[in-house]
Amino acid sequence: MTAPDDLELLRAVEDSLNKRWPEAKIDPTLDRIAALVDALGSPQLSYPTIHIGGTNGKTTTSRMIDALMAKLDYRTGRFTSPHLESVLERISIKGAPISASGFVATYNDIALYLDLIDSRQPHPLSFFEVLTAMAFVAFAEFPIDIGIIEVGMGGEWDSTNVLSPSVSVITPIGMDHAAYLGNTVEEIARTKAGIIKPESHVV
C-alpha cells in the first residue's frame, strides 16, 4: 500500500509532468532527449537493452520478453506506454510498477537537469521525453541486468532511440500515425526501422 504522503508527492510530480509539452504534440527530433541523457551521464548505456518497435503488439512483446528474462533470473527493467490507470505502470522493475516513492525520487534526481535542458532548447522537454529519461535513470540506479524498452511512436526520432540495443525487435507494421510517419506502409516501416543499430541483432 502506498503511504498518503507518497501519493501527495506523486500527484505533485504528475502535475509537473502534465504541464510539459504533451505526448500528442509531435516535434520530431532527438536533440532534447540526447542533451538530457548526455547531461545525466548516459544511464541508458549502463546496461544491455532490447528495443521494441512496430505497430501492433509492442507492449505484449515487451511483457513476454520481461517474463522470459525473469524466468532466467535476470533483474529486468521495462518501459512501456501508454499507461491504463497509473503513470507508475510505465516504469516496471522486476515485473512490478515502480513505487510512488521511487518515481518521485527519480524525478527529483533529474529535476535540475530538466531545467537546464529546457533553458537551452527552442522547446521544453516533453512529457514523454522526461518519462523516458526517468526510466533510464531508475533502471541504472536499481540496478537492472537488462532493459526492455518500448518505442512510443515511430522509431527513428522516438525519444527512446538514444539506446545502443543488443537486440532490436520489430513487431508487425501497419498504417498508423501516417501524418508523422509516412503515407505508405513502406515509409512507416523505414521510420520504425530507425531503431536498428549496426551493432544490434534484429528480430
Language-model features: where?
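Conserved Switch II/interswitch segment of TRAFAC-class P-loop GTPases
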Residues: 172-180
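Internal gly/pro-rich beta-alpha loop/helix module
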Residues: 166-167, 180-203
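ATP-dependent carboxylate-amine ligase catalytic core
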Residues: 9, 30, 35-45, 71-163, ...
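A conserved segment at the C-terminal end of the G1
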Residues: 48-52, 60-80
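Fold-independent oxyanion-binding glycine-rich loops
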Residues: 80-82, 150-153, 172-173, 191-192, ...
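Residue-level signal for inorganic ion chemistry
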Residues: 17, 55, 76, 148, ...
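Charged, amphipathic alpha-helical linker segments immediately N-terminal to NTP-binding catalytic cores
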Residues: 1-25
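Inter-motif core of Ras-like GTPase G domains
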Residues: 161-172
